[in-house]
């Protein structure tokens, strides 16, 4: 699909007209694990579905287009995407990253550092990242916004500085999606997502994606993914394509809802701080009395107390015991992820119901 089209058009028409044999408008679901060769020495382009599958290939085509990238690979989960991205870097690489990041990423970073595979340096602010880039760095890895403190970073500035030092730049774009941010355009070498979240958008798909503009990186990534086999299944590829079609509409609605909810939270006597970037559906906030958090979570009727984010349903998460439980308390507290923080993923419900639910739980 042409990247010259506007992103809303690319999304709405994701995967259409891909079946030349029948003219089917919707991308077919190809379950076959193997493909017949027309003749000896000939291939249709598909041989074994771990290597390449028609449905997955169509999903990857759309994912590359919306991220302004030339290449995309769909993986079996967001963590599989992170592991795949790091598979192209030599053992012993020095990685500079942010302290505030997804707990699963921290858990894996911590494990591979113990094994001696990579060495990590953590920074709390953009200024600290810039200062650390004066040192020997092989990889700059950032989330922006970060999870869950919602810190934003200037990708273009950091990429320019990193590249001047010969470092590669990897960006996790899960929170914003390509609707609000396309890091490839700002100089990132690799961009990844937990496609489970906003891209698929319905809490029924486990998926990841890695995109790049570099043929050299793509060939390494493709080889490693084919070898390890953590590919996205045909069915999940089909579901992902379907979810992508409404991405821009969902992001627009969740952002509109989030802005109204932020306005409410900022006036609530039960809330002492709200963390929101002004766009997207992710909000974090700190309560006045953290002892009331169990009551708040148990009192909600419209919000679901659950991990994950980016679906059409609104969720509330307590990072201390859920997404960031593997990060030691003293580490979390040192950079501001304290036990009084709750995270919201705002869905597409009527915002009046969402605000009413929060009000009765926070102030009741």
Each predicted region: which residue ranges?
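Positively charged, small/polar-rich N-terminal and surface patches that mediate targeting and assembly
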Residues: 2-8, 230, 263, 310-311, ...
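Short, well-ordered beta-strand elements within core beta-sheets of diverse protein domains
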Residues: 242-249, 281-288, 343-347
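Conserved N-terminal alpha-helix of the aminotransferase class I/II PLP-enzyme fold
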Residues: 34-83, 87-88, 104-111
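N-terminal "arm"/small-domain region of PLP-dependent enzymes with the aminotransferase-like
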Residues: 1-53, 61-62
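PLP-dependent enzyme catalytic core of the Aspartate aminotransferase-like
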Residues: 119-121, 250, 318-364
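Conserved small-domain helix->loop->beta segment predominantly found in fold-type I
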Residues: 259-313, 327-329, 333, 359
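Conserved PLP-enzyme active-site core in the AAT-like
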Residues: 2, 11-13, 72-270, 275
